[in-house]
């Protein structure tokens, strides 16, 4: 399947494999992502004039808001970051400032580009790693030896490399030089402080950045892979490409946008900093320049997708300027009992398939009767109605409860085929779901 140039129809067909229903949401987002590709095909002067149409997704938790955006960004290999609006504070308050979401996007973009470059050089990196380990295992060739000896050494080296590739020497130990583990730097601090931190770390580690370690050949492969990757990759080019890609095709998903809306019903009881966060967010969404450790990035061509349940507030409770920056609005449907059943049976990587694969590792074959699946869907739906509606996430907890004993005693069932029946599902869940006081314990 093509990547960046996927058509809206192809995008929706791909999403249908993983997410049931939500046709309108899929359609709107597919068009928005396709427009990213269309814009990049235009002349530079016209590209600058076309800004993305940001999207506001309205729907309860667990109905697929995040999953739709995340799946598209993944298949199209676009820089993507998901953040929660409620985690940010107004400038001047203790907490994360809104610009850090752009810095997170750039970090993800650089990592994405780096992994792509590593994949292209994969064979070259592996060859260099194998050769280096083989030379460590073979005694070095003395100076001034004959051509015949040199040829013998080359043949021995080749045989040694073949044995390393086949894993025959994985348990052998060798001494290699590896780079010291770098100190973690908090990427949420302002770029100026980041640069100072990096310079201080470089200064103190310059002379003693490598240490000798005795590792197994298997461990050495991984350790050397990272080192050789750094020498073969053009770090500066990767940073520049990552910055450029974040700027032209980055996607920021802002969840819980409703948590910073100031509800007119609550009036003065609302946290005054909520409106402050909205005002800080406004220039980022409108288009501004944000400094990152990789350089400056303009935000006007980043696609922003905001999402929220809006149970206690309305989209109109957001400040008017911010509302105007999210012109496309999509309402997602709540999950019905039928959709719950389809999620369990029709998605490509359904929860049932996941649990079957996990237990197969222990040699346990699990099969679900259709009536059992329908009962799971029914009881999960009922739990959502009686308690807080958490959408498809409820299915995880109900299935976990049904399979709890089998998972715990998996070694006792090894080599057996187990069928999950409607009666078993009822015995594990029905009492809990029937008692409204206990529903909350099924999350």
What are these regions (language model features)?
Residues 1-443:
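Non-catalytic accessory segments flanking P-loop/AAA+ NTPase cores
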């Amino acid at each position: 399947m093509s990547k960046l140039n996927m058509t809206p129809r192809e995008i929706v067909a791909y999403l249908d494999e993983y997410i049931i229903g939500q046709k309108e949401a899929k359609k709107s987002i597919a068009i928005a992502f396709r427009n990213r590709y269309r814009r990049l095909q235009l002349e530079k002067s016209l590209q600058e004039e076309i800004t993305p149409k940001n999207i506001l997704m309205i729907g309860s938790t667990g109905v697929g808001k995040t999953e739709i955006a995340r799946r598209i960004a993944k298949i199209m290999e676009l820089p993507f970051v998901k953040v929660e609006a409620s985690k940010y504070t107004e400038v001047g308050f203790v907490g994360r400032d809104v610009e850090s979401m752009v810095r997170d996007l750039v970090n993800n973009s650089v990592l994405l580009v780096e992994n792509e470059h590593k994949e292209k050089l994969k064979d070259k990196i592996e060859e260099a790693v194998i050769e280096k380990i083989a030379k460590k295992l073979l005694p070095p060739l003395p100076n001034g030896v004959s051509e015949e000896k040199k040829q013998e050494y080359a043949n021995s080296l080749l045989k040694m490399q073949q044995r390393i590739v086949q894993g025959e020497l994985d348990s052998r130990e060798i001494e290699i030089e590896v780079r010291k583990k770098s100190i973690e730097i908090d990427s949420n601090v302002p770029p100026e402080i980041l640069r100072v931190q990096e310079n201080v770390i470089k200064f103190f580690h310059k002379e003693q950045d490598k240490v000798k370690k005795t590792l197994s050949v298997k461990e050495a492969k991984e350790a050397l892979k990272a080192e050789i990757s750094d020498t073969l990759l053009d770090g500066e080019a990767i940073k520049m490409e990552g910055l450029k890609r974040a700027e032209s095709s980055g996607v920021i998903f802002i969840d819980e946008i409703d948590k910073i809306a100031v509800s007119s019903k609550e009036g003065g009881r609302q946290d005054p900093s909520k409106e402050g966060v909205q005002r800080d967010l406004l220039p980022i969404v409108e288009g501004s320049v944000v400094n990152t450790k990789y350089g400056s990035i303009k935000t006007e061509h980043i696609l922003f997708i905001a999402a929220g349940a809006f149970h206690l507030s309305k989209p109109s409770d957001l400040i008017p300027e911010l509302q105007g920056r999210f012109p496309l609005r999509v309402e997602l449907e709540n999950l019905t009992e039928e959709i719950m059943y389809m999620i369990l049976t029709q998605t490509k990587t359904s929860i049932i398939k996941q649990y079957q694969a996990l237990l197969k590792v222990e040699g346990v074959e699990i099969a679900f009767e259709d009536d059992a699946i329908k009962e799971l869907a029914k009881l999960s739906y009922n739990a959502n109605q009686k308690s807080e509606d958490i959408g498809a996430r409820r299915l995880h907890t109900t299935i976990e409860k049904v399979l709890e004993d089998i998972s715990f005693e998996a070694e006792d069932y090894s080599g057996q085929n187990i069928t999950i029946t409607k009666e078993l599902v009822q015995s594990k869940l029905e009492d809990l779901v029937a008692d409204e006081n206990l529903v909350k314990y099924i999350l």
